[in-house]
Amino acid sequence: MTQVAKNDHRLMQVLLAPVVSEKATLVADKNEQVVFEVARDANKAEVKAAVELLFKVEVQSVQILNQKGKQKRFGRFMGRRNHVKKAYVSLKPGQEINFEAEAK
């Protein structure tokens, strides 16, 4: 496993937003996982370090998903949605991230 540079500025840029969807909430309830949208150049070690730094929790594992943007029609023009990189973060037993309490 590679050593992660403890550059706090870089780690603050890794996590972009939590993913709020039906699938993400099912995964969170069933498997104690949290889904984040992450930077396109982020790796598993950086995501793990960023979650542990920002939320003060212990991470068990990280799975990365590269989602291609869909082709969509805008009027008579064809376009494409942006590509997205997601991270499924598994927390150790007993750990929890509460986004409502973090916002206060």
Swiss-Prot record:
The keyword Oxidoreductase does not apply. GO terms for cellular component: ribonucleoprotein complex; ribosome. GO terms for biological process: translation. It holds the Pfam family Ribosomal_L23. InterPro entries: Nucleotide-bd_a/b_plait_sf, Ribosomal_uL23-like, Ribosomal_uL23/eL15/eS24_sf. Disulfide bonds: none annotated. Gene3D superfamilies: 3.30.70.330. GO terms for molecular function: rRNA binding; structural constituent of ribosome. Keywords: Ribonucleoprotein, Ribosomal protein, RNA-binding, rRNA-binding. Belongs to the universal ribosomal protein uL23 family. One of the early assembly proteins it binds 23S rRNA. One of the proteins that surrounds the polypeptide exit tunnel on the outside of the ribosome. Forms the main docking site for trigger factor binding to the ribosome. Part of the 50S ribosomal subunit. Contacts protein L29, and trigger factor when it is bound to the ribosome. PANTHER family: 60S RIBOSOMAL PROTEIN L23A. This is Large ribosomal subunit protein uL23. It comes from Cupriavidus necator (strain ATCC 17699 / DSM 428 / KCTC 22496 / NCIMB 10442 / H16 / Stanier 337) (Ralstonia eutropha).
